[in-house]
Amino acid sequence: MIRIFKTENGLIHQKDELSPGSWIALTNPTATEILEIANTYGIDPDDLRAPLDEEERSRIETEDNYTLILVDIPSIEERNDKDWYVTIPMGIITTEEVIITVCLEETPVLGAFMDGRVRDFHTYMKTRFILQVLYKNASLFLQYLRIIDKKSGVIEEKLHKSTKNRELIELLELEKSLVYFTTSLRSNEVVLEKLMRNEKIKKYPEDTDL
């Protein structure tokens, strides 16, 4: 799915046509949609497909006419009527004209921007948008970590009163989520450090508070 957003008079609007200063949000895009965006903005289709591969690692790559930023974001996976916490890739691509996000699924990381719930957000301020997305992502990780911590405490209490395997399996699953999150946060930190050193990403004094 392709959705186009643009800030006008301080408000976010969904648009029907591509134009400079827009944010193009690709969610589980089809092969046709990938080729359309790739051809329009001179992007290697493989770079648009990369965030759709769950095995992709966080990284930043700079090409002649665009920069690809890949980070891990937290996601909730439902199994056996329970919520489990995993990570999936999300791509941010900046060109001279637009900013593009690519993800396998809808994510709260981007939902707040689409709904106009983020202050001082402008689709044409690409560097600020990237930093705001990374901040929102880090906040979501922390939110889920608090939930995992609370769930772990409840299960540990049950384990003291029970010897059932079910509680032990749940605790091991939560421990696995913590490992995923820790690894992803470290990788994202490296990407952020490289991003701040990247000469192709313009830096503005007003973004230092982010």
Predicted features along the sequence, with ranges:
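Peripheral, non-transmembrane regulatory/ligand-interaction domains of membrane transport proteins
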Residues: 1-209
